[in-house]
Structure formats: structure tokens, C-alpha cells
Amino acid sequence: MDSEYKECVDSLYDKEDHLFYRDNKRIPLREKNGSKQFWGRGNGWVFAGLPLIIDNLPLNCPSRNYYIRLFTEMAEAVRKTQCKDGDWRTSLLDPDSYKMPENSCSAFMCFGIAWGIRNGYLPQRTYKPVLEKGWQSLVKAVHSDGKLGYIQPVGAAPKAAGFDATDVYGVGAFLLAGSELYKLSCTYH
């Protein structure tokens, strides 16, 4: 697993911005504001996936610190790309081109941050406000019937999604984030 994962990181991880390109075709592309194209949900997959890898590695695994370092590097980029209203957009470095939340991304980011705080990899003082703003933004997108809105449809690049746009992967990410927030609240109470 390590060699394949590291090969992907070497190919798709931007060491300057600490975010991932969706694929090699995206590396030369730029958003309307001239920034690199870092797709929110794609980075959410990685940011939420790293805790699952770390949780399943033995404490003495030689590559464990590699994944922890990657997670904490990404966490800082995730923190910096959060919008003032608490959400993350479909394009992480060009939020003005996509003025609405992208809640599959936002939920994955909240899950990762909550996990990082709970496990001691992210300082609570720095990341708890990010988590709280992110969660509040997600909750505002829950419809009266329980549906979660602002979930970008299946795609391979940033695209806008409205309040009524939903899909199971976004709802699943929201439930994952909520369960991790619950674990975090039990840890600190």
C-alpha cells in the first residue's frame, strides 16, 4: 500500500499548497482567478481518508509518521481555504467563482479536523473554531425534510451546486462528520 500511495502523492500532491490535484490533466489548468485547480471534494476524500489509514496502522509502523505528516500539512491548507461563512467551496483556491458551499467537501473537511483534534494531531485552540464554523455551515444546509443541500453532482472538476442539489456521498460524509464530532464531544466532556 505504501508504495502505491506514495506514488500518487509524488504525482498529484502540490508541495507548495499542500493540496492534491484530481489527476495529472488538472496540473496545468488554472481557475478564473489564475489559481491552481484544487477540487474540494477530491481533497476531502484524501483528507478524510488519511485518518482511516492512520487508525489502521500499528503504532510501530515505519510509515505511520509519513501519513501523519501529510495529514497535518493538509490540515493547515484546509484551515486556510475555509471561507468566512464556514464552508469550503468546490474550488479551494477560487471560492469567488463558486459562491455557494460544496457540502460533500465541507463534511469531509469537518470529519478530518474533528478526528485530528480528538487524536491530538491538531491543536484544539487553532482548529476548534474552524470545525465549529464548518459544522454550523453544514447544519444550515439541512432541509426541513432532512435532506442535505449544496452537494456537487458526480463530476471530475469544480462545478456549482445549489441548495436543492444532494447525493448519498455528501450525506454519508455529513454523517461521518457528525459521528466524529460526537466522539470529540465525549472526549472533551
What do the predicted segments below correspond to?
Residues L29-A48, L59, S63, Y67, ...:
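Solvent-exposed loop and edge beta-strand segments that line ligand/cofactor-binding
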Residues M1-Y21, I68-G86, P129-K147:
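Long, well-ordered core segments of solenoidal/helical folds
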Residues M1-P51:
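Loop-centered beta-sheet repeat module
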Residues H18, K25-R26, L93, Y127, ...:
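Short capping/connector residues at structural and topological boundaries
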Residues E4, G49, I53, Y67-L70, ...:
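Alpha-helical packing segments of well-folded alpha/beta enzyme cores
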Residues I53-N56, W115-I117:
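Extended, well-ordered alpha-helical segments in internal regulatory regions
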Residues W88, M100-H189:
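CBM-like carbohydrate-recognition segments
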